[in-house]
Amino acid sequence: MSSSPLTRTAQAAALEASPGPTRRGLLFIVSAPSGAGKTTLVERLVEQTSGLKMSRSYTSRPARAGEIDGVDYNFVSRERFESMVDAGEFLEWASLYGHLYGTCAADTERLLADGHDVVLVIAVQGARKVRAAGVRTSTVFVMPPSFAILEQRLRGRSKDSEPEILRRLQVARDEVAAFSEYDFVVVNDEVTAAVDRLRSIVIAERARRQRMQGAAEEIVRTFS
């Protein structure tokens, strides 16, 4: 018995929105200066978007108060991190603010193979390494509304010393200049609006013809 047109449309929508064995996941990269709010935005995006996972980076830095291993980051010693680098275990890794950060290639591949779309929240230099490796990805740069607001946010979160804040602001000047390397730009002027913009990007990327090819061809066959 053939399915009704409504059922066929529902199947196509499911392929777009949800993970599954018929579809390999999409890889997204979100980068931003420290303090721009990228982690908060992506965490809310994942909460609101089915089939989307946030990759947890590995880092050699000590956990801050309130941070949980395996939830905020995978915290490892510098020696362990360097051994993972030597073993080729990272899709990308970077040195930032005196600490090492990296994305485990096997963890990411496992999620993508299972049909999950994956978001990497990584630095500009890490994003460059992923692109240089020829990995297909959609990239988003999150910008603060202004330098003054970024400085206000960094000081307001009370996580860093004065020298560290000044260091992060200096790095931010170089990072924002890299926005043109990304496919999309989202200005985080208001959290809810910025999350909506990110979600629109995910929805649009899922609907690209190349990614809907199988579902579209299946629908076309119902017209035969």
Report each predicted region and the residues it spans.
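Extreme N-terminal, non-catalytic leader segments
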Residues: 1-27
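C-terminal accessory "lid"/substrate-recognition subdomains
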Residues: 2-4, 200-224
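P-loop (Walker A) phosphate-binding loop of NTP-binding proteins
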Residues: 31-33
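Conserved lysine of the Walker
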Residues: 38
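Post-Walker A alpha-helix
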Residues: 41-42
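Post-Walker A helix-loop "phosphate-sensing" segment adjacent to the P-loop in P-loop NTPases
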Residues: 46-55
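ATP-dependent small-molecule kinase phosphotransfer cores
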Residues: 57-120, 124-128
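A glycine- and Lys/Arg-enriched "phosphate-lid" helix/loop adjacent to the NTP-binding pocket
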Residues: 61-66, 89, 112-117, 124, ...
